[in-house]
């Protein structure tokens, strides 16, 4: 069976030894980049082919002073259409997307077979809510990135009818 072959492959390889981190990163950006670096190493060394990373809890009170947002993320998401709150929310969302772009760049620069690790990967980045003010869970913005070893056509923006379930993406 395939699982038997996979087990034999794993036994035949030396596992890399990584040093344990010395402490908790001092900024959220450092933490996110560290998580993405570990994920890239795990993919590169084929320790795993699946991973998840949640940027924060659904009701996180995390503030982002490094980008000029002193209010908590969850509170800002209940913006009540206040332009200042909407601007702060846009800054947070942009900040998170920049961190995801860091990961994409990292994978793009790791050779893998006939391309890059990104060419042979499929990644999903998104959110569980489109309008926190209304607790609106429809029209969720999602990014699908990577080449999936030639099985994914990129460079497109797709918009579906309002009643299309997100599960259709999977």
PLM-predicted stretches and their roles:
Residues 3-170:
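Ligand-binding pockets and gating/stacking loops
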